[in-house]
Amino acid sequence: MARYTGPAWKLSRRLGISLSGTGKELEKRPYAPGPHGPNQRKKLSEYGLQLQEKQKLRHMYGMTERQFRRTFDQAGKMPGKHGENFMILLEARLDNLVYRMGLARTRRAARQLVNHGHIMVDGARVDIPSYRVKPGQTISVREKSNNLVVVKEAIEVNNFVPEYLTFDADKLEATYTRHAERAELPAEINEALIVEFYSR
């Protein structure tokens, strides 16, 4: 399944979650798009709830189904809870951490920064958004890209960097000090439903 490239606001309303992280998509119309307005939602089956939860998380991180399932399978080989490990692996993606650093206002914009070669890991350019960052590695903006308008604008409005990143705003770099804990990850996601979905 290909990555969704349509209007993020429409997908956010359909899934009932802000994919941009701003919450603006749901302010005026917190219901799915369509001609029937706020009264169109039907009660979902158990399978429907599981599928919806999977789609929420997959689209939140901007992944294809193949990438998503591969990461899920990798998480299942780790010690500990499958669902929590899955969330931790998703959070360690390079494009996501660029977003968490505040260098981009959305994950989609962060993915573009990585794709276009503006991001470095431990001093080497990495242009693979799915690159999994390891604790202790440093993420930075290429010196030639320090004055990008999109980066400057994103930093101006960002007021939160998670505790598993130590961010130096002057150098535009952060160290991924440790893996995220479940309490630091999206509370609106019930990963147990996703484990159930793939275990059917």
Curated annotation (Swiss-Prot):
PROSITE patterns: RIBOSOMAL_S4 (PS00632), S4 (PS50889)
GO CC annotations on file: small ribosomal subunit
GO biological process, alphabetically ordered: ribosomal small subunit biogenesis; translation
Keyword annotations from UniProtKB, A to Z: Ribonucleoprotein, Ribosomal protein, RNA-binding, rRNA-binding
InterPro entries the UniProt entry points to: Ribosomal_uS4, Ribosomal_uS4_bac-type, Ribosomal_uS4_CS, Ribosomal_uS4_N, S4_RNA-bd, S4_RNA-bd_sf
Stored Pfam families: Ribosomal_S4, S4
Annotated segments matching region Disordered: 22-42
Coiled-coil boundaries: none
SMART domains given in the database record: Ribosomal_S4 (SM01390), S4 (SM00363)
Gene Ontology molecular function terms on file: rRNA binding; structural constituent of ribosome
Database matches in Gene3D superfamilies: Ribosomal Protein S4 Delta 41, Chain A, domain 1, RNA-binding S4 domain
SUPFAM superfamilies xref list: Alpha-L RNA-binding motif
Residue stretches making up the S4 RNA-binding domain: 92-152
Domain of life: Bacteria
Purpose of the protein: One of the primary rRNA binding proteins, it binds directly to 16S rRNA where it nucleates assembly of the body of the 30S subunit. With S5 and S12 plays an important role in translational accuracy.
Subunit note: Part of the 30S ribosomal subunit. Contacts protein S5. The interaction surface between S4 and S5 is involved in control of translational fidelity.
Family assignment from sequence similarity: Belongs to the universal ribosomal protein uS4 family.
Name of the featured protein: Small ribosomal subunit protein uS4
Organism the protein comes from: Bacillus anthracis
Lineage: Bacteria, Bacillati, Bacillota, Bacilli, Bacillales
